Swiss-Prot record:
GO cellular component: cytosol; glycine cleavage complex
Name by which UniProt lists this protein: Glycine dehydrogenase (decarboxylating)
Lineage of the species this protein comes from: Bacteria, Pseudomonadati, Pseudomonadota, Betaproteobacteria, Neisseriales
UniProt gene name: gcvP
Subunit-level organization: The glycine cleavage system is composed of four proteins: P, T, L and H.
Gene3D superfamilies tied to this protein: Aspartate Aminotransferase, domain 1, Type I PLP-dependent aspartate aminotransferase-like (Major domain)
């Protein structure tokens, strides 16, 4: 071999793609294709094929890619940040950093739809909810939202649903975070709400259906909101308070002031700033509002043996069920970050977080006292952590601070803001005092003289974090073992394949993950001076260039921090485009009946009218019906939302014609990027005819699902839509038009996880990306071929091929045997597998997506499990096993089934170890089947007693 060959630039390709060359040959033989090229030709329509190489650089080996990205990261200047504005430096407990954030047992799991194999993550989320309930004083909380700004927008929408007021006006505190107001302006316009800004004292002067107050204010000032909340509620309004999570440790709770809803960012509980995210927003509310709340809610139920078990509660509120009638389009949220924040509270406990909050306040109070003592002027005297100083020499102080490695907040010409935080030290305090006063500080003397700056009426008196979980795990050994106990209850991809259709659970390679905790990326404030963020901007520009090459679009907006947010940003660009042409009346959105629930939910949020397009018997969009409806609504047609390949798992032959029909009638084509993993290197959405599309970086581009978030959903747009991307009021986005409001709190969404996708593309290169897609198609067709021996495959394309996923139809078996898709999903747990996507897009089916990363041996294990389950169904159907007492209806079996009486017509071995491979590496569900009905009839969304788990 030559030296060039020995320096293998394609080494990562073999790490990412599961099957070997020999195994691929076996799989091709099994599906009856002479080559991978022939299989692709049989699968994709010829008129959409990309017959050239993607314009991407040559692939880099892992070590080289890491070194190159480190060089980019090193261009960032990470000053000590005292900017505030919702983002603060933190001290992430290293035991949590290493064992959760950097642990695939936590970050490769999926949203806990299959609760029996997600009890650890669900307990961590319940802890998060309990933490939020304690801090806000409200009765219920959800398991996170995307960021504080979108949480505020969700609060406004929720107020509109539950308020008895007939007003369409919503009051916004003039002290609200600027990025929050920016996002609320975007949402309010399309909800038909009028935002009225003013000081809290003005809230009682008008008639409002709701109000949002900031606590403390964006400048740090403290105000008792009690009378202002009462004034709004007296007129039938619903009141939300956006509250700093660390401040709530020390301050009177929003509920004690009369708030109906409380929200905010939990970033300060151990999650790095990351140039804006990802972070978990919290969202708490009164019990009476629970059925109108957005987002996932974790609830307590019982399993088949009466044991306490956890699950996602009240799912009928959500987009995957209610579609355009859903409370929100929220899908992926921020589970991994919520878990970190909740575990931070578990590790520190009430006493620990009180000490941290008290230290932060003391630093601010000493600083304020020193400035006043030196003759300086404070903008206000009551604060928790942020001090604003009116300094005539503000320019000189700001410049000196920068030179000393400190970032302050500029407010106008003469005012500087200094926001203290957990990571601030005594030496930082001394240096800041010297910068503002011009003389060295005697910290001990100042400490003795400084007064508390929290008014007595606003000091917290109510208890927090009293549950035993927050008062037990304070030594590192105990914390380590508690987190390991939780991890062991969850099935993640470090155990087995998770073949969820439409979710693309592929490899999250270690080399891709390593950069996210580098301090150059992790510790950057999103509003840091641009000259300090050169490395981040180079990374983002590089990723945008990669994504343009892959999709064919002219512009990429990185702001949407989930797929649902990407949908919203895309429809927003379309609406703004129509408005710019004097066609604001265009509000009809055509959506195929097979679409994901977020599509109609998002269209509804944009005040569009959803018109459903039929699908034919083969699962394709009914082109005749589409044409008829496009003609019928031509005067008002705004858009078509379509997924490609379809949610039925096939490449529809008529996709170009579909796009042409919509364009001919004045509409724009929004392509949902959920299935982009079947396109990369073979075709491009922009070439097919899409005007805008979102890309799930947490699917196609390897960001892990985190157990339910984080995600990233940037959008690609053609040139005519590019001027209408989201901008940002605090940190303008390069290429965005001034005045366009935001969709997310941070200018580049969850920027700190973008290195994952950048690394993936850099290590794969053009040929590697294409091979990944080809292997995804091969694996799906291999599964479809092998499984068709046991179950009917519901949809195939023109040549009998599926795309990157396939749907097996369980309805005939259900009719014949009574065994349901739920029974099959639960039984798969006994075989060590997470179930595929259940009853979507067709009820009574399973949608299976293996991805390119799974080795043939894992695919074969899954096939063996499904074949064995089919044999079990046959035994039920034949009467050999009773319909109400068999391994399927009793699944999953837990460790509790090992011992005790066994009154079942099948052996214990059959129930617990149904195939030989299971015995070698058994994953145990920690509970038996959970009673969903009980959980929704008895809604409990806070931590139960420790004894209840016994």
């Amino acid at each position: 071999m030559s030296l060039t060959e020995l320096f293998n630039r394609h080494e990562f390709l073999a790490r990412h793609i599961g099957p070997s060359d020999a195994e691929r040959a076996e799989m091709l033989a099994a599906v009856g294709a002479p080559s991978i090229d022939a299989l692709v030709d049989q699968t994709l329509p010829a008129d959409i094929r990309l017959n050239r190489r993607l314009d991407l650089p040559s692939p880099q080996p892992e070590a080289e890619a890491l070194a190159a990205l480190k060089a980019v990261a090193s261009k960032n200047v990470v000053n000590k940040s005292f900017i505030g504005l919702g983002y603060y430096p933190v001290l992430t407990p290293t035991v949590i950093l290493r064992n959760v954030l950097e642990n695939p047992g936590w970050y490769t799991a999926y949203t806990p739809y299959q609760a029996e194999i997600a009890q650890g993550r669900l307990e961590a989320l319940l802890n998060f909810q309990q933490m939020v309930i304690d801090l806000t004083g409200l009765e219920m909380a959800n398991a996170s939202l995307l960021d504080e700004a979108t949480a505020a927008a969700e609060a406004m929408a929720m107020a509109g649903r539950v308020s008895k007021s007939k007003s369409t006006r919503f009051f916004v505190d003039s002290r609200v975070l600027p990025q929050t107001l920016d996002v609320m302006k975007t949402r309010a316009k399309y909800f038909g709400f009028e935002l009225v800004q003013g000081h809290p004292e003005e809230a009682g002067n008008g008639d409002y259906f709701g109000a949002l107050f900031q606590y403390p204010g964006e400048a740090g000032d403290l105000l008792d909101l009690t009378p202002h909340i009462a004034a709004v509620k007296a007129k039938g309004g619903v009141v939300a308070v956006a509250a700093d999570v660390m401040a709530l440790v020390a301050l009177k709770s929003p509920a004690e002031m009369g708030a109906d809803i409380a929200l905010g960012n939990t970033q300060r509980f151990g999650v790095p700033m990351g140039f804006g995210g990802p972070h978990a927003a919290y969202f708490a509310f009164k019990d009476e509002m629970k059925r109108s709340a957005p987002g996932r809610i974790i609830g307590v139920s019982i399993d088949a043996k009466g044991k306490t078990a956890l699950r996602m509660a009240l799912q009928t509120r959500e987009q995957h069920i209610r579609r355009e009638k859903a409370n929100s389009n929220i899908c992926t949220s921020q589970v991994l970050l919520a878990n970190i924040a909740g575990l931070y509270a578990v590790y520190h406990g009430a006493e620990g977080v009180r000490r941290i909050a008290a230290r932060i306040h003391r630093l601010a109070a000493i600083f304020a006292h020193a400035v006043k003592e030196a003759g300086g002027k404070l903008v206000f005297d009551r604060f928790f952590d942020t001090v604003q100083v009116d300094a005539p020499k503000a320019d000189a102080i700001y410049a000196a601070a920068l030179a000393a490695g400190y970032n302050l907040r500029r407010v106008g010409k003469t005012v500087l803001g200094v926001a203290f935080h957990e990571a601030a030290t005594e030496s930082d305090l001394a240096k800041l005092i010297e910068l503002f006063t011009g003389k060295p500080a005697d910290i001990a003397a100042l400490d003795a003289a400084a007064l508390d700056a929290i008014p007595a009426a606003l000091k917290r008196e109510s208890a927090i974090l009293t549950h035993p979980v927050f008062n037990t795990h304070h030594s590192e050994h105990e914390m380590l073992r508690y987190m390991k106990k939780l991890e062991n209850r969850d099935l993640a991809m470090n155990h087995s394949m998770i073949s969820l259709g439409s979710c693309t659970m592929k490899l999250n390679a270690t080399s891709e993950m390593i950069p996210i905790t580098w301090p150059e990326f992790a510790n950057m404030h999103p509003f840091a001076p641009r000259e300090q963020t050169v490395g981040y901007l180079e990374l983002i520009e590089g990723l945008q260039k990669q994504l343009k090459a892959i999709t064919g679009f002219d512009a990429i907006s990185m702001q949407p921090n989930s797929g649902a947010q990407g949908e919203y940003a895309g429809l927003l660009a379309i609406s703004r485009y129509h408005e710019s042409r004097g066609e604001a009346h265009r509000n009809i959105c055509l959506i195929p009946q097979s679409a994901h629930g977020t599509n109609p939910a998002t269209a509804q949020m944009m005040n569009m009218q959803v018109v459903v397009v039929k699908c034919d018997e083969a699962g394709n969009v009914d082109v005749a019906d589409l044409k008829a409806k496009a003609e019928q609504h031509a005067a008002n047609l705004a858009a078509l939302m379509i997924t490609y390949p379809s949610t039925h798992g096939v490449f529809e032959q008529g996709i170009k014609e579909i796009c042409e029909i919509v364009h001919a009638h004045g509409g724009q084509v929004y392509m949902d990027g959920a299935n982009l993993n079947a396109q990369v290197g073979l075709t491009r959405p922009a070439d097919i005819g899409a005007d805008v599309s979102h890309m799930n970086l947490h699917k196609t581009f390897c960001i892990p699902h985190g157990g339910g978030g984080p995600g990233m959903g940037p959008i690609g747009l053609k040139a005519h839509l590019a001027p209408f991307i989201a901008n940002h009021v605090v940190a303008p986005v390069p290429g965005a038009v001034e005045g366009q409001t935001a969709v997310s709190a941070a200018p580049f969404g969850s920027a700190s996880i973008l290195p994952i996708s950048y690394m993936y593309i850099a290590m794969m290169g053009a040929e590697g990306m294409k091979q990944a897609t080809e292997n995804a198609l091969l694996s799906a067709n291999y599964l479809a071929t092998r499984l068709s021996e046991h179950f009917p495959v519901l949809y195939t394309g023109a040549n009998g091929r599926v795309a990157h996923e396939c749907i097996i139809d369980l309805r005939p078996l259900k009719a014949a045997s009574g065994v349901t898709e739920v029974d099959v999903a639960k039984r798969l747990m006994d075989y060590g597998f997470h179930a595929p996507t259940m009853s979507f897009p067709v009820p009574g089916t399973l949608m299976i997506e293996p991805t390119e990363s799974e080795p043939k041996a894992e695919l074969d294990r899954f096939i063996a499990a499904m074949a064995a389950i089919r044999a079990e169904i046959d035994r039920v159907q034949s009467g050999a096993w009773p319909a109400d007492n068999n391994p399927l209806v009793n699944a999953p079996h837990s460790k509790a089934d090992i011992a005790g009486d066994w009154d079942r017509p099948y052996s214990r071995e059959q129930g617990l170890f149904p195939l030989p491979y299971v015995l070698e590496n058994k994953f145990w569900p920690s509970v038996n089947r959970i009673d969903d009905v009980y959980g929704d009839r008895n809604v409990v969304c806070s931590c139960p007693s420790t004894e209840s788990y016994m």
